[in-house]
């Protein structure tokens, strides 16, 4: 299918089409001075005319000089909050005369259309697919949500100072894993379909074939994002670098700065750790087993009866970095990092993992 | 190392319900529970290999990872030896015979018993660490003629911490030489004093290159056991440890049990030492 053109004024028609097909729309919207992902009703909820300015430890919204809908990069949220919900019921147990009756929770009835998924985020979804769907055990919560979602990707036309997707080979161009991908021009979007459902939706919209000039304009817009990327993570030999430097002095250095607040793991679009807890009614006859996001930065994460395994910030920061960039490769055949830069932006003390890796490349004293 | 029996089809969070059929007090704070499935179908399908574990679930309290300590040929009824440690194990201790709880499993890798054929075998168990090795003892006894010299070195903090002592005479008679030791002696104790590693240091090893050692206990104990065994000439590829980490899911999805690149719940708990050593040796990993 050739690239198509959707007039900006017709973006709402796409939303209407998806709503008509039963999808609840989730997309970027401004809330609490950030661009977050939330349920949206119309194009009016999009962060039109806003951009984000990011740096290690800092995030700020600023008005744009134009009316772009998607003229920002990525915010604190990622799509994992819909596919791998922060809180989910795994099992219910009800007391019976002879013991307990246990059941899986009902499958969700809602299905979501994600609007504005960036290339690094498509990569992150693929990383979580590998964790939750492609191992020996399939996570039913993730699967039920993943099977039902519709993905409208958006190609980046600018980059933040914290972006390094080019180092991770995850962006900025959306290559696969979407139903539709948009590139925003000043008056229109170039639309690519990446799946049969995407092509079907296209068939129901007032699209026309893009002209060579329009396609060239889209190419130029996407090139701006590539040109805007300044950060780099050297990935050559990174697995061995990290796993053979487990006693490097840099771990103590970063531990002196790290607050072990877990922000980096919460904003990370691939971190998948969780803990399970019990929620009981007053009589104790109805119990829900609930799974909640957890983080290797929490002390209790590695608690055993004999004590805590990772009992200092040094060992916890080391777990995060070595897991994300090294042991993830052993476990899942790919890096756990997609280069979105969220952990750098949302670190309250501006720790930048690319700098930590660079320092680990220096031999210890 | 062996792969899980079969990838569980369906929802890995679903539990079977099991009923406590019998409770045998072992030592202070430790009892062996015999379980039976409430669903006969599940009972017929259930099989495990020595070294694997189940997740036991008490609704409203939580789950705990507990090794199978039954005879591996047990059908329909099998046992777990459980030490009261915290919330779940305490609540379990409050249930009597007939009590019903949830169970998921079996999970994880198993001891390499087939690799032990034709070889001398040393089992080194610290405290409750003997529980996951008991099915190995049963297998070795059942197929005694296939193995060389068989030794169990069992250490505990005090004489009262030695496990399954009522069975030791049978094991000795069947051809598994049991040696016990305690860290702290007591008035009525005239046995060995010191750690199980001391026993290992003293153990004659006629053919270390043809000896397999399996160990389960606290990390430090396994650490020193491995070191002593290597010094005595056992190859690292013939040492096996069973590791313990916090576990929430037992199916590689919660992240808690990571030890370097390994998920202890899936890749372990039983590891060949040469595979895990670079990570097992690092403090706080
Ligand atoms: C593979 C494996 C096999 C085991 N086999 C046995 C056995 O045969 N017999 C036996 O008595 N014990 C065994 N344990 C230890 C047992 O799992 C813990 O003692 C138990 O989880 C403690 O739970 P609790 O709720 O009573 O204690 P709490 O201290 O209240 O535990 C609270 C939570 O902390 C975590 N936790 C605490 N201690 C441990 C621990 N040691 N290991 C993993 N998670 C922990 C769990 O998530 C638990 O739900 C085994 C552990 C593992 C990992
Ligand atoms: S970095 Fe930490 S929180 Fe994230 S997946 Fe790894 S262990 Fe879990």
Question: Where do the model's predicted regions map?
Answer:
Chain A
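Single, functionally critical "micro-switch" positions that shape active/binding sites
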Residues: 21, 261, 340
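A generic structural-conservation signal
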Residues: 27, 267-268, 346
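Extended amphipathic alpha-helical segments enriched in small hydrophobics
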Residues: 255-265
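Residue-level detector of anion-binding/catalytic polar loops
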Residues: 24, 264, 343
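A donor-sugar binding/catalytic signature common to diverse glycosyltransferases
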Residues: 263-279
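Iron-sulfur-associated redox domains of electron-transfer enzymes in respiratory
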Residues: 1-243, 249-251, 271, 282
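Ferredoxin-type iron-sulfur electron-transfer modules in oxidoreductases and energy-metabolism complexes
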Residues: 235-256, 274-365
């Amino acid at each position: 299918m050739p690239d198509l053109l959707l007039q900006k004024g017709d973006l709402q028609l796409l939303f209407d089409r998806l709503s008509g097909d039963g999808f609840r729309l989730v997309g970027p919207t401004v809330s609490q001075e950030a661009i977050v992902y939330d349920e949206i009703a119309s194009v009016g909820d999009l962060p039109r005319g806003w951009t984000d300015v990011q740096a290690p430890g800092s995030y700020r919204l600023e008005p744009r000089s134009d009316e772009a809908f998607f003229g920002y990069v990525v915010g604190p949220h990622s799509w994992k909050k819909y596919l791998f919900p922060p809180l989910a019921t795994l099992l219910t147990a009800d007391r019976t005369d002879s013991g307990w009756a246990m059941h899986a929770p009902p499958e969700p009835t809602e299905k979501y259309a994600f609007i504005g998924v960036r290339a690094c985020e498509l990569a992150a979804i693929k990383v979580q697919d590998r964790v939750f769907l492609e191992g020996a055990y399939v996570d039913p919560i993730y699967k039920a949500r993943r099977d039902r979602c519709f993905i409208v990707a958006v190609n980046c036309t600018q980059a933040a100072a914290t972006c390094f997707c080019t180092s991770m080979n995850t962006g900025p161009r959306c290559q696969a894993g979407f139903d539709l991908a948009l590139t925003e021009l000043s008056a229109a979007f170039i639309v690519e379909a990446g799946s049969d459902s995407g092509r079907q939706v296209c068939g129901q919209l007032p699209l026309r074939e893009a002209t060579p000039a329009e396609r060239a304009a889209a190419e130029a817009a996407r090139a701006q994002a590539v040109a805007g990327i300044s950060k780099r993570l050297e990935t050559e030999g990174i697995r061995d670098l990290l796993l053979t430097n487990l006693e490097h002095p840099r771990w103590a250095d970063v531990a002196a700065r790290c607050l072990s607040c877990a922000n980096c793991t919460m904003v990370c679009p691939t971190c998948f750790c969780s803990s399970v807890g019990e929620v009981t009614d007053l009589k104790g006859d109805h119990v829900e087993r609930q799974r909640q996001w957890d983080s290797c930065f929490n002390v209790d994460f590695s608690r055993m009866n004999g004590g805590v395994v990772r009992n200092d910030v040094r060992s916890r920061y080391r777990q995060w970095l070595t897991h994300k960039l090294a042991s993830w490769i052993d476990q899942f055949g790919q890096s756990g990092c997609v280069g979105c830069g969220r952990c750098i932006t949302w670190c309250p003390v501006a720790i930048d993992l690319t700098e930590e890796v660079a320092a680990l490349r220096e031999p210890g004293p | 190392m062996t792969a899980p029996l079969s990838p569980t089809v369906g929802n890995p969070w679903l539990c079977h319900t099991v009923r406590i059929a019998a409770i045998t007090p072992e030592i202070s704070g430790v009892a062996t529970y015999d379980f039976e499935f409430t669903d006969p179908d599940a009972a017929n399908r259930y099989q495990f290999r020595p070294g694997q574990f189940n997740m036991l679930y008490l609704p409203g309290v939580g789950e705990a990872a507990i090794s199978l300590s039954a005879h591996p040929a047990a059908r329909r009824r099998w046992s777990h030896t459980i030490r009261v440690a915290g919330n779940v194990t305490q609540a379990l201790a409050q249930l009597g015979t007939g009590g019903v709880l949830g169970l998921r499993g079996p999970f994880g890798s198993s001891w390499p018993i087939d690799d032990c054929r034709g070889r001398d075998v040393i089992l080194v168990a610290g405290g409750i660490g003997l529980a996951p090795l008991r099915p190995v003892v049963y297998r070795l006894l059942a197929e005694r003629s296939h193995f060389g010299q068989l030794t169990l070195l069992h250490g505990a903090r005090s004489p009262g911490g030695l496990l399954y002592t009522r069975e030791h005479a049978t094991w000795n008679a069947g051809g598994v030489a049991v040696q016990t030791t305690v860290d702290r002696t007591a008035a009525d104790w005239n046995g060995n004093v010191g750690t199980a590693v001391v026993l290992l240091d003293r153990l004659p090893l006629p053919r270390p290159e043809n000896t397999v050692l399996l160990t389960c206990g606290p990390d430090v104990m396994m650490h020193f056991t491995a070191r002593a065994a290597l010094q005595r000439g056992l190859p690292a590829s013939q040492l096996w440890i069973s590791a313990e980490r916090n576990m929430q899911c037992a199916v590689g999805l919660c992240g808690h049990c990571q030890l370097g690149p390994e998920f202890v719940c899936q890749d372990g708990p039983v590891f060949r030492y040469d595979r895990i050593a670079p990570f097992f040796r690092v403090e706080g990993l």
